[in-house]
C-alpha cells in the first residue's frame, strides 16, 4: 500500500500538490508513481517563467523501466524548480513527498477545486 499524506491534494495522473503559505503550489510525484516507475534516473522539469495550463505535460520522469510525463495540476506560472531533484533524481524514490519538483503561481481565475483529496486518491490507486 502506498503512502498517501492527508494534508496534500492529488491528481489522477499521480502528482501531489501542497498549497504554501504564500499561495504558491508545490508539486511532486506520488509514492505510488515512484514505486510503479522503479529507480528514477532522470527528471526534465519546466522552465521558470513558463505559463502552463492544467493538464499540460510540463516535464518527464525517466526510470530504468519507463518514461512518463509530468503534468501541471493547475493553470499558472512556474516560479521555481528543484535543481537538487534534477541533479539527484533518485531522491524521489527515497522520499516522494519530501522531494518536490516545481512550484506554481496560480493563474488569475484558476483554482485547485479539481484536485482530489487523499481518500479519493487512495481509492484511485487501490
Swiss-Prot record:
InterPro entries, A to Z: 2-oxoA_DH_lipoyl-BS (IPR003016), Biotin_lipoyl (IPR000089), GCV_H (IPR002930), GCV_H/Fam206 (IPR033753), GCV_H_sub (IPR017453), Single_hybrid_motif (IPR011053)
SUPFAM superfamilies (alphabetical): Single hybrid motif
Positions where N6-lipoyllysine occurs in the chain: 65
UniProt keywords, alphabetically: Lipoyl
Cofactor, how bound (note): Binds 1 lipoyl cofactor covalently.
GO cellular component entries: cytosol; glycine cleavage complex
PROSITE patterns: BIOTINYL_LIPOYL, LIPOYL
Cofactor(s) it depends on: (R)-lipoate
Residues annotated as domain Lipoyl-binding: 24-105
Biological process according to GO: glycine decarboxylation via glycine cleavage system
Top-level taxonomic group: Bacteria
Pfam families: GCV_H
Assigned protein family: Belongs to the GcvH family.
Complex formation: The glycine cleavage system is composed of four proteins: P, T, L and H.
Chain's role: The glycine cleavage system catalyzes the degradation of glycine. The H protein shuttles the methylamine group of glycine from the P protein to the T protein.
UniProt name for this protein: Glycine cleavage system H protein
Organism in which the protein naturally occurs: Burkholderia vietnamiensis (strain G4 / LMG 22486)
